[in-house]
Amino acid sequence: MCRIRTFRLRRKRRVSGRSFCRSRIDPGYVRERPYIGGRSRPTTFHLTRKKKAPLGGDLSPSFARSPVLEPSSPPQALSVPSLSSEKKTASPTCVKHHLSGGAVRRANTVVPRTKKRTSRHHTLMSTTCRCWSSSIVLYEHLDARVSDVGKTSRRRRCSLGGTLSGSIISIVAKRDCDYDEPHHLFFMLLLYKRLMSTTLGISHLVKHARFSSLQGTLGSLKGTVYRPKQKTHTCNRSTTSNDTKTQSYNALFMERTWNKKTIAARAKPKPSGEAGASFPTQSLGSLSSFFFPDSLKNHRHSPMTRNQLLEHKRSQQVETNKLDDAITLYCVYIDRCEFVGKKRRCMMHNDRETGDCSSLPNANTQTHRFPSPHKEMRPPPTNEADSCSSYDGALARRASSPLREGTSGSSAHRPKQQCLLHCHQSISCILFPPNSSPQHQFALLRKVVATAAAATGRSSSPRPQTLYMCRKCVNTCYCPMRLVHRYMFQNLLIHLRAHRLGVSSSSNWPTFSTTVVNPCTTTPIKTTSSSSPRPRNDTRSPPILGMCF
């Protein structure tokens, strides 16, 4: 078994590297065979005694050649919640090649001597580097003030690498990455949370020119909240112009506090033909306001000294702690789908303490889990003629006879599509404290996304969809919304804003061209919720707002 490691040099076609092969005679020796010029040449093999790797990683010359990372001490790994059930440790070899930007090839790749080396040999093969497939590891080099985060999805062969130097973070995608996927969004959120709590903060995004998915996702998340004067790319197309990239990045910087003049100037209503025209969005905040706090705007382009960096780190830690103390994640329950033979069955995770979010007495209630009221409901139909009334019979039967744990119910009560939720799809229910600001609501949504994406990232479905449902609307009618993941924050905040204004949103759901939304126009039905249904003419603002999605 031979592990070949090559490093591509920029603006050069020559490939320099070494091939290390274990000797079958003595496992303590290593055959060293250098090759130059992009093709193998017959050379003399030198048997050298294999050196033991130092504690913390193999600091070979290839690792030391990194232009940014030159630590005086071995890197220290900080454990981060794993994305899968099985725990794996990061291999120093994988860490070295991932941080140095080198390409890893398959072990059984044979390079012909007669043909010229092609680009397919330099492709990053994520199956070789297992250390990034199941966990996210953060390496901090205190001397160089550089932190690196890497993650690879083995199933999608997507490699993400992040580098923080000073107050600049770089997120680079080396293979086909879809930032609309929940586990990729989870990587971004975890990266933000880790950097804001352990390092210096974020003031600018620097992204690879070939991949603009991150830029398109953030542009879509902004939605109608912020409209820059210059056009930005909101699609997943490659961006090659530096001017366009700079304009897009500048559009992400927002003021954290919105005064009345700014709100009045930027809150321009949409035309009547566009979606979401009846919902004001002036106080919904912005995603970039949380990614880029105003405390970093003075240091956006000016370098900071070490004392300034440490002071900023301490101040940012205080802000993060205050935000975490003010917001609490209340209810989280998970519907899981497992494959039993060729059939899929839904498993329910029940606890002794069950209930409903609306039955919580106050905002300081401890976190608990409860059964799902919309456990096996079908997705909304694509035909607009088919409304929510078609679900009444199935929902009423399911509400009267709850399903047992580990089963899908009888065949008579089972819909055509057994599981609305895909495998390991997380459904989170959150409650907002009374009179909570939009910024706090947004931060709470961000926490729930990280929780949901941690389970969704292990899904075996090709493209897991997310179910969005307002908890207040459950008492009147089931209004599921299967939306594209990027519209998540905008739609939920618009819907909550409508609740706070007393708008009957059961028939005024925001619609988008890329979503399938069916407004509920039927009469209220009884559900498994413990609270009584709210009448449609009740326009009072509820004391606690909540949602399940």
Swiss-Prot record:
Residues 523-534 have a biased composition (Low complexity). Residues 75-84, 356-369 have a biased composition (Polar residues). It comes from the Viruses. Keywords: DNA-binding, Phosphoprotein. Transmembrane segments: none annotated. One of its GO terms (molecular function) is DNA binding. Residues 50-92, 353-391, 523-542 are annotated as: Disordered. This viral structural protein may have important functions, such as protein kinase activity, DNA binding, and possible transcriptional activation of immediate-early genes. The tegument is a granular zone surrounding the capsid. This is Tegument protein. It comes from Human cytomegalovirus. The lineage of its organism: Viruses, Duplodnaviria, Heunggongvirae, Peploviricota, Herviviricetes.
